[in-house]
Amino acid sequence: MIFTDYRNVDLTNKSLRTVPVALYAHAEDIKSLTLSRNPMLDIPGDFVQLCTSLQELRLSNMSIKKVPQSVQNFTTLMGLDLSSNRIGDINDIALYRLPDLQELRVQNNRMEKLPWYFPRLHLLRLLNISNNKFQDVPEEVCKMSSLEELDISFNMISQLPEDLQSLQRLKILIIVGNRVTRIPDSFRRLSNLGVLDCRRNNITELGAVSLLPNLEELLVGHNSVQALDVSSGPLLKRIDISHNDVTQISLAPGPVGRIPVGLTYLNVSSAKLSSLDDLALGQLTSLEELTLDRNKFRAIPDSLGELSLLRSFSCSDNLIGALPSSIGRLQRLERLDVHNNNLTEFPTALWNCGSLERINMTSNVIAHIRLPSLPPASAAPPPPTLGFPESALSSTVTLVPCLPDRKASTTGSVAPSSRSLPPLVKSLQRLYLGENRLTDDALPLLMILRELRVLNLSFNDFQELPRQFFKEIVLLEELYLSGNKLAGLPTEDLPRLNKLEVLYLNGNRLLTLPQELGKVINLAVLDVGSNGLRYNISNWEFDWNW
């Protein structure tokens, strides 16, 4: 066995039953030693005495039931990992002999209690006892005043003791997957707590936990909370209260009389919300990600347009019939997901979103794609971002026909000129419009989205693609046209699709495939199933006509 670095020795899964002899001569140089996943039951005492500089020892996944006695003699240890074993208790190992121990990981074991001496571990900052058999928070933990991070997840704990308030240095508390029903009022004294993760419990109310002055992240998903009163502290940035029974969100002023405008992330998906307070939403001006999936919304307030920093907005699986026109003011919006709603048309305001890269409007009832209307003649001229030529604008795109038999000289009038393209044209890369009611009238405006990499138009009512459909969208990597009524493909620009890798044409009315398809050099996936393709075995050089 050859070693190149004696400071950090990793012997994971080497089928070792003892420490290699080659390490003895360099034992004093070892800072970190990993012996995980080996059938080793003990560490030789003479080797331990030679390790005068060891700071980290990892003994995880070794199927041990008892901690090797020699571990307590590594007096310079700062981190000890005993996770994922079969340890029932650590009472017979004197860890208090490790005066510098700062991190102890004993998760994924079979422990029910902690040793009496744990409060004597005066420097211990991190303790992970998750996924054991604790029915209560060990009283020893409440006396460990040096703790900064505590993980007691996936035990059988039903109540948090009031004495946890004594952990004044605690910054991270993780209690995921227990049976806790409430957060004690005494938690307001945990003034240094920055992260509280209490997902997957039975919590019905949060109390004043969000008032903590240093709390930055509050994760309460998969509980039974019915109302969220976010009277937040000054540093709160992230709230995840998904998968609860929330029917109301109130954003009341905090202790210093200010609204929690510092929030950057809010997830209230899979709740029971039917509306949002217009004024309250408009106050969350620092939001960057807002997720409202799987609720009962029929409308989104106009104040959505006040969230000028919003990058991601997801409101899928609701009952929304239209998006507010104010969404066009979200110039930093990059991702929009509103699939499985009741949208009847592509929101015209979206054409003004200059950073939008991904739109998912799958499974709606969209029948139209429209451009914004021109302002009245007496009005001030439109801003540069909406300077469409009059010949390209209409209330619907039906006024701009584009048929396969139209000459090339006339197809150029389908789209606005390159100098007046709406901002969305230059940013949109992924567009998902599958399972809607779009017809051929919607195709001209899709043809100008020249930055598209992924376009999904499956399961609509398209019958014929314009002759120059592929002229501008040559950056396509994936194209989905399944489940339409297409009888052919336009061939003029097919060879220019040199980035196309995935093409789905299944479930159409194709009788033949164009020979030009063979010139799409990077095509890796082609699905033409469930068509009427004819194959002539005698005409092998035209093998495309399957």
What is each residue range found by the language model?
Residues 3-55:
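LRR N-terminal entry segment and analogous cap-like coil->beta motifs
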Residues 9, 31-35, 55-59, 77-82, ...:
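Conserved hydrophobic beta-strand positions in leucine-rich repeat
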Residues 14, 38, 62, 85, ...:
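Consensus "Asn ladder" position of solenoid repeat domains
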Residues 19-22, 43-46, 67-69, 90-93, ...:
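The feature encodes a structural signal of leucine-rich repeats
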Residues 25-29, 49-53, 72-77, 96-101, ...:
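Leucine-rich repeat
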Residues 97-98, 102, 106-232, 237-249, ...:
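Solenoidal tandem-repeat scaffolds enriched in leucines and small polar residues
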Residues 205, 217, 226-230, 236-239, ...:
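Leucine-rich repeat domain C-terminal region
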Residues 258, 270-274, 279-280, 291-294, ...:
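Eukaryotic tandem repeat interaction scaffolds
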